[in-house]
Regions:
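Active-site nucleotide/adenylate-binding loops and adjacent lid/helix of ATP-dependent enzymes
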Residues: 2-7, 70-75, 84-139
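Serine/threonine-rich low-complexity intrinsically disordered regions
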Residues: 15, 36-39, 44, 62, ...
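Short, solvent-exposed loop/turn segments at secondary-structure junctions
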Residues: 10-11, 58, 138-139
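Short, surface-exposed alpha-helical segments at coil->helix boundaries
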Residues: 15-19, 63, 67, 92-95
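Extended interaction regions within the primary functional domain
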Residues: 29-30, 100
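Short, charged N-terminal beta->alpha structural module
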Residues: 1-28
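N-terminal glycine-rich "phosphate-gripper" loop used for MgATP/nucleotide binding
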Residues: 31-74, 80-89
């Protein structure tokens, strides 16, 4: 079986799980390859039997392009990340959806695009000492 592990050309940091994942799949007989979603010279998803989206960290830089790539990929090969789930979690509001369902998540606050906010005050009001800031991405 030929498996693509979707990633991106420029990763913000090394992925410590990447090498063990590739080794485990290869040990089970899979022909596995990293496939950068944002590399026009990369093989097409149709060249693979299956694909899993793994470390496509830079999709916030081109959310429309990434969304279109996911749609094309789903038409060409079997995605192990179901397309409806991919669409749903492209926007960080999915964290609030999970929280409402009682699923533990990192405490989350969404800010409207362009909103003036004092992040230190927001964190202090919520009792947060550690903060992660990510783009929400519009659907």
């Amino acid at each position: 079986m030929r498996i693509a592990i979707a990633t991106c050309r420029r990763k913000p940091e090394p992925d410590p799980d990447e090498a063990p994942l590739l080794a485990a799949l290869r040990a089970r007989g899979a022909d596995v390859e990293l496939l950068a979603w944002d590399d026009p010279a990369a093989p097409r998803p149709a060249d693979f039997d299956r694909m899993v989206l793994r470390s496509t960290w830079n999709y916030p830089e081109d959310p429309d392009g990434f969304r279109a790539w996911c749609e094309r990929s789903a038409a060409e090969t079997e995605l192990w990340n179901p397309l409806p789930a991919l669409r749903w979690n492209l926007h960080k509001r999915y964290l609030l959806d999970l929280q409402v369902r009682g699923i533990p998540v990192v405490p989350t606050a969404l800010l409207a695009r362009g909103a003036a906010a004092d992040l230190l005050e927001l964190a202090a009001d919520r009792g947060w000492t550690d903060v992660v800031i990510k783009p929400a991405i519009e659907n």
